[in-house]
Amino acid sequence: MSGGRRKEEPPQPQLANGALKVSVWSKVLRSDAAWEDKDEFLDVIYWFRQIIAVVLGVIWGVLPLRGFLGIAGFCLINAGVLYLYFSNYLQIDEEEYGGTWELTKEGFMTSFALFMVCVADSFTTGHLDHLLHCHPL
């Protein structure tokens, strides 16, 4: 036995049905990616919606967009961006996933709740200096 270290082999790529398994992140960015696993695609839609909710929530809290127009704007942008993503960019058959409405509402309520928390949090943080100053009566 020699005193040298044993050389570790690099990990082999995972195989799925005899083909190389492609990572989810590379599929998200490629318009010609094939989505064999429906749950994997629905997970991507769900998390993409959550990212949109955080970004829009911070923007809405900083600007401050409030009321009906703020909520309606969030709903339209959130649904519109995802619809453009899966119908125009990926060009998937919506009927395989239960129709356009099923994909549009996938994870919507949790993203709406996250949006509301981010709006309140960023609005409060942006106006924290007013809350910290105590004015005598």
Curated annotation (Swiss-Prot):
GO terms for cellular component: endoplasmic reticulum membrane; mitochondrial inner membrane; mitochondrion; multi-pass translocon complex. One of its GO terms (biological process) is multi-pass transmembrane protein insertion into ER membrane. Keywords: Disease variant, Endoplasmic reticulum, Intellectual disability, Membrane, Mitochondrion, Mitochondrion inner membrane, Transmembrane, Transmembrane helix. It holds the Pfam family EMC6. Expressed in embryonic stem cells and differentiated neuronal cells. Residues 66, 128-137 are lumenal. It is a multi-pass membrane protein. It comes from the Eukaryota. Belongs to the EMC6 family. This is GEL complex subunit OPTI. It comes from Homo sapiens.
